[in-house]
């Protein structure tokens, strides 16, 4: 694997190519895509990205569709909260 430095982190593999601002954008994306997330089914921090938009929990073996680089997208969170709010209004 390519050598990385303390300052640039995961994008050290690109060296001096592509420009600093583009590498900073890619760094943010790559950190979020390689991170482990909390599984919404079992609650463990085992949710890992398998492919673009495919997330797999190593503990409960559930596979779900999510965002390309993050487990939850902002639009999905908005829709989920709206559905929850509408269900609460319906129950009252």
Swiss-Prot record:
| Subunit structure of this chain's protein | Component of the large ribosomal subunit.
Q: Which organism is it from?
A: Homo sapiens (Human)
Q: What is this protein's record name?
A: Large ribosomal subunit protein eL43
Q: Where are the zinc fingers (C4-type)?
A: 39-60
Q: Which domain of life is it from?
A: Eukaryota
Q: Which SUPFAM superfamilies match?
A: Zn-binding ribosomal proteins (SSF57829)
| Listed GO CC annotations | cytoplasm; cytosol; cytosolic large ribosomal subunit; cytosolic ribosome; extracellular exosome; focal adhesion; nucleus; synapse
The cellular location(s) given in this protein's UniProt record come to: Cytoplasm
């Amino acid at each position: 694997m390519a050598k990385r430095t303390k300052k640039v982190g995961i994008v050290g593999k690109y060296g001096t190519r592509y420009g600093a601002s583009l590498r900073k954008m890619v760094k943010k994306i790559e950190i979020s895509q390689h991170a482990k997330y909390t599984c919404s089914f079992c609650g463990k921090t085992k949710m890992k990205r398998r492919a673009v938009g495919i997330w797999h929990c190593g503990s409960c073996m559930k596979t779900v569709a999510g965002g390309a680089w993050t487990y939850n997208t902002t639009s999905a969170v908005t829709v989920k909260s709206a559905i929850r709010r509408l269900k609460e209004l319906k129950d009252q």
